[in-house]
Amino acid sequence: MVPSNGAKVLRLLSRRCLSSSLIQDLANQKLRGVCIGSYRRLNTSVGNHANVIGDYASKSGHDRKWINFGGFNTNFGSTRSFHGTGSSFMSAKDYYSVLGVSKNAQEGEIKKAYYGLAKKLHPDMNKDDPEAETKFQEVSKAYEILKDKEKRDLYDQVGHEAFEQNASGGFPNDQGFGGGGGGGFNPFDIFGSFNGDIFNMYRQDIGGQDVKVLLDLSFMEAVQGCSKTVTFQTEMACNTCGGQGVPPGTKREKCKACNGSGMTSLRRGMLSIQTTCQKCGGAGQTFSSICKSCRGARVVRGQKSVKVTIDPGVDNSDTLKVARVGGADPEGDQPGDLYVTLKVREDPVFRREGSDIHVDAVLSVTQAILGGTIQVPTLTGDVVVKVRPGTQPGHKVVLRNKGIRARKSTKFGDQYVHFNVSIPANITQRQRELLEEFSKAEQGEYEQRTATGSSQ
């Protein structure tokens, strides 16, 4: 007996499932992989028994998802396709329009738009609106796709209609079964989709929103280091309800949408997907009232102040990261991070070039000619610098290790002193007479050298 195309595929799937060490390894972590049955069981199944491929539990214990391998029957052959024709909540809209953001929106914008709409459209807040729950589900579905980078990239590539059609069949990337020869279907792509989806659950960003601020520093504050208090607006846990979203003492009620299980089921072709209940967030319970201060969002917009330590040697446009002091997470996970970008003002005396600094020193005519000593400013105070006789404009001297200490290092840069010569615009009569005598003497020496050279 020659097995059908469907049987061949099922054989590959069962072997892949039973021999895969990856799923077994994941059992020791947060993911259980249970593959039940064999080729014989799969090939002869006539019921709707579902074999669990994997399950997932989030940090909070509320967000769970099971992907179930649906029932196969003996008539499953070469003409069956993974594509489906199921309806979609948003058949006439794209996900970006649902959330009211542009296609170039950043992750933070998408998250902000979602929380705003979720708060506005939550069924508990719109008990008189029969369409509120549907709208809430639309917003949640759009956010579920756009918050995940890989799903969003796929969505942008194939477009809304193609994505919805394929998603209704359970496999965003499948090509379906072709007539007779299989049409390019690769059964391993199915397991790739399963594994990818499962791992993506772990890779999804958790925590509150990151905050970015600018901080103005003087030149010396950047060079020597300092402490600054940064104040900014961000999401903060609601004080009224303690971040719970409901008034203290509010009684819990069993969620009617999921009957207290915390999960709802979606049937997509051969797949039965159980996902977190959108109404109760997987808790299995709801509340009769919500907090009036945060309107159930658990967080409110407020002002926050954080003390930031600036290391010595920072430079203009440097960005410092202060972990977990950003926006509060409505789900109760870790706060976001604070990113402080520095704007360092220019100094009237010092010019910076990496760890080195440059200063100008102005010499009088006589100092340049005769030499001597001058005082030069440094980062730690004035020092005396020797001027060689005959110093020309533009000459420089180097003061070793008088520059800036490099960040997180014990090494210092150098200081460069650039000499300029100041020519007086006004002089006294005596100074003129002396300069004229100097000029005559200089001219005489020149003529004498010329005459001596000619006689030779």
Swiss-Prot record:
Protein location: Mitochondrion
GO BP terms: chaperone cofactor-dependent protein refolding; embryo sac cellularization; embryo sac development; nuclear membrane fusion; polar nucleus fusion; response to heat; synergid death
Description of the deletion phenotype: Defect in fusion of polar nuclei and in synergid cell death.
Main subcellular localisation: mitochondrion
Protein name: Chaperone protein dnaJ GFA2, mitochondrial
SMART domains linked to this entry: DnaJ
General function of this protein: Chaperone that may play a role in mitochondrial protein folding. Involved in female gametophyte development. Required for cell death of the synergid cells during fertilization process, and fusion of the polar nuclei during megagametogenesis.
SUPFAM superfamilies per record: Chaperone J-domain (SSF46565), DnaJ/Hsp40 cysteine-rich domain (SSF57938), HSP40/DnaJ peptide-binding domain (SSF49493)
Keywords for this protein: Apoptosis, Chaperone, Metal-binding, Mitochondrion, Repeat, Transit peptide, Zinc, Zinc-finger
Keyword Zinc: yes
Organism: Arabidopsis thaliana
Pfam families given in the database record: DnaJ, DnaJ_C, DnaJ_CXXCXGXG
Family membership: Belongs to the DnaJ family.
Transit peptide: 1-89
Residue positions binding Zn(2+) 1: 238, 241, 291, 294
Entry annotated with the keyword Mitochondrion: yes
Tissue: Widely expressed.
Ranges: CXXCXGXG motif repeats: 238-245, 255-262, 277-284, 291-298
GO molecular function: ATP binding; heat shock protein binding; unfolded protein binding; zinc ion binding
Matches recorded under Gene3D superfamilies: DnaJ domain, Heat shock protein DnaJ, cysteine-rich domain, Urease metallochaperone UreE, N-terminal domain
Recorded name of the encoding gene: GFA2
Domain J residue range list: 94-159
Recorded superkingdom: Eukaryota
GO cellular component assignments: mitochondrion
Residue ranges covered by zinc fingers (CR-type): 225-303
Binding residues for Zn(2+) 2: 255, 258, 277, 280
